[in-house]
Amino acid sequence: MLDIKRIRMNLDEIKAAMARRGEKGFDLDAVVALDEDRRTILQEVEQMKNEQKTVSKEVPKLKKEGKDVSEVMEKMKTLSAEIKNLDVKVKEIEEKMEEILLRIPNVPHPDVPQGDTDDDNIEVRTWGEPTQFSFEPKPHWEVGVNLGILDFEAASKVTGSRFTLYRGMAARLERALISFMLDLHTDEHGYTELLPPFMVNRASMIGTGQLPKFEEDAFKIPQKDYFLVPTAEVPVTNIYRDDIIEGDQLPIKYVAYTPCFRSEAGSAGRDTRGLIRQHQFNKVELVKFVRPEDSYEELEKLTNNAEKVLQLLGLPYRIVRICTGDLGFTAAFKYDIEVWMPSYNRYVEISSCSNFEDFQARRANIRYRPDTKSKVEFVHTLNGSGLAVGRTVAAILENFQQEDGSVVIPEAIRSYMKGFEKITAK
């Protein structure tokens, strides 16, 4: 959520930022007008309260002098009723303001490139060379089906489209990757591991920015008004909702594995085969709470932590700086890590690493105290996939496939696979 004071003081700048994003559907002038009404009423309330105090002081004085206080008491009663009515008006205005503010996206950082689609993202760096084959490589879903380790038909029968049943070595590979990623981020990168709930309440979804705008993309449990987590970012960030963190605790670094659930509304026809776009998938997520002055340095570190997974697995990738049109609702700045997928003949997103600045913190009211003598401020929040597990499985099946249909297991995870070096058909 944007600070209303920031909008009021820099209205033209905020309008220009929204224009950079190509965003519409909300009225910045309206929210500024509502804020003006709110502040005017609050001034009236303050004046009435001061008058109320002055009048209340007259009562004991008049009583002491033996004079009638009924007129003064009636005036106090009238002032009290007027204040109560104005308080109701302020609450109504604030609710209208919040309704608008919750739908306004974050302001892009000045270094975010201008653009409309992912074609306008800017490549920052690459690692490794695209995998070359002496044969025509198969897409990962064919590799998995031929090996008997991915069963899309059974998953479709059990549930529906965009679900996968992992069998045998695929299930072991998925589990191995989750453990490998968690161990790397805790043991080498200093994150604390969490295992959060896989369902969250509405306040949590609002806090991280999924609601109200993206409710159609969420899986809801209507009996409780709970939501299946679209990402571990939601429960982990909301641990500190409405809390004040002591400054000496920052930065706080968490890593969490969760299954993720997304309806993928609006993605019909995109990546309909394989593991790339599923309704349910596993992900290891990195989340940071940091001081504002440190947030961009911490974003670089977080991105480095995520890409280390791919380096150890030996998977070629690139990092791109995301343009305004592809930035997403909550981020001020974002990197995507894209892994090379031979069957696509292109790089495919496997991680997004974002700095939200104080956007989520304002929505979730997450503050910190810089030191014992300072006023509280909003923290900056960051997160990134470290990594999307299903897409990592897909990348391994594609990049390490052999001409005989087998798949070489990356050396870094063989200890998690009971020493198996290769996946072969049974």
Swiss-Prot record:
It is found in: Cytoplasm. ATP binds at residues 262-264, 349-352. Pathway: Aminoacyl-tRNA biosynthesis; selenocysteinyl-tRNA(Sec) biosynthesis; L-seryl-tRNA(Sec) from L-serine and tRNA(Sec): step 1/1. The keyword Protein biosynthesis applies. It comes from the Bacteria. It is an enzyme of class 6 (ligase). Its EC number is 6.1.1.11. GO terms for biological process: selenocysteine biosynthetic process; seryl-tRNA aminoacylation. GO terms for cellular component: cytoplasm. The keyword Ligase applies. One of its GO terms (molecular function) is serine-tRNA ligase activity. It catalyses: tRNA(Ser) + L-serine + ATP = L-seryl-tRNA(Ser) + AMP + diphosphate + H(+); tRNA(Sec) + L-serine + ATP = L-seryl-tRNA(Sec) + AMP + diphosphate + H(+). Homodimer. The tRNA molecule binds across the dimer. Catalyzes the attachment of serine to tRNA(Ser). Is also able to aminoacylate tRNA(Sec) with serine, to form the misacylated tRNA L-seryl-tRNA(Sec), which will be further converted into selenocysteinyl-tRNA(Sec). Consists of two distinct domains, a catalytic core and a N-terminal extension that is involved in tRNA binding. NCBIfam families: serS. Belongs to the class-II aminoacyl-tRNA synthetase family. Type-1 seryl-tRNA synthetase subfamily. This is Serine--tRNA ligase.
